[in-house]
């Protein structure tokens, strides 16, 4: 049997059981709820608590989005009480990048970002040649799609990345704009 735990709407994976809630911050938060409901939470050790906190922090951009429910912070508090080190996780997730990754981000923001003020949207793209030029490694562009949301008035962004045999597309939004309607 296959159990799928996910916080995204309408997962495409075929499964026997689906545990889903689009109102939570992250899949990690759902896993925490699942462990509570199945009374397995007492088996959570420091390492497992750290993994769940990492998932919550990654999916919320260190609590900058998808983190408006007090229940999320209660879970974070419990994970910290179990030994998860929030500062260490934050450093590893958000302050641990290579120079080439930072230069790729700079190139993307300065040369490859288009702003469409009348649509409150932004678009970014990178070609496979640019990825090669900046010695791209899997994960180097993680979070790039979020940066245009920092521009005043922008509520939707799309990031296109040309891979060897497909184009990877990421969408993000803020406020009441539902990016998942595009995917």
Provide a role label for each language-model segment:
Residues 1:
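N-terminal small/polar loop signature for handling phosphorylated ligands or for N-terminal nucleophile
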Residues 58-183:
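Hydrophobic helix-and-loop "lid/oligomerization" segment in the mid-to-C-terminal part
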Residues 7-75:
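Short alpha-helices
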